[in-house]
From Swiss-Prot:
Signal peptide: none annotated. This is Large ribosomal subunit protein uL24. Belongs to the universal ribosomal protein uL24 family. SUPFAM superfamilies: Translation proteins SH3-like domain. One of two assembly initiator proteins, it binds directly to the 5'-end of the 23S rRNA, where it nucleates assembly of the 50S subunit. GO terms for molecular function: rRNA binding; structural constituent of ribosome. The keyword Nucleus does not apply.
Length: 103
């Protein structure tokens, strides 16, 4: 998977095309990610101990990983991801600027 939790990404297709956000969760086995503020759905919840009110909540739903691209830390544009070995470790790099994406 070319993106991971904490990456700043842009949605490149679908109803939320053009929106930017941070990845909150990644599900590699399903090839899906949850992006902050993207693909919002209404969830109906029963009253519980934690939420005695219950009601309708807005929350993010997973979207396919092919619909997001990481943002280049240098330019802020979308970029493809490359891989490079530095000091014996494999790191992700932005193809546009060559900057390392891994923190």
């Amino acid at each position: 998977m070319h993106v991971k939790k904490g990456d700043k990404v842009m949605v490149i297709s679908g109803k939320d095309k053009g929106k930017q956000g941070v990845i909150l969760a990644a599900f590699p086995k399903k090839d899906r990610v949850i992006v902050e503020g993207v693909n919002m759905v209404k969830k109906h919840s029963k009253p519980t101990q934690a939420n005695p009110q219950g009601g309708i909540l807005n929350q993010e739903a997973p979207i396919h990983v092919s619909n997001v691209m990481p943002l280049d830390p240098k330019t802020g544009e979308v970029t493809r991801v490359g891989y490079k070995v530095e000091n014996g470790k494999k790191v992700r790099i932005a193809k546009k600027s060559g900057q390392v994406l891994d923190n």
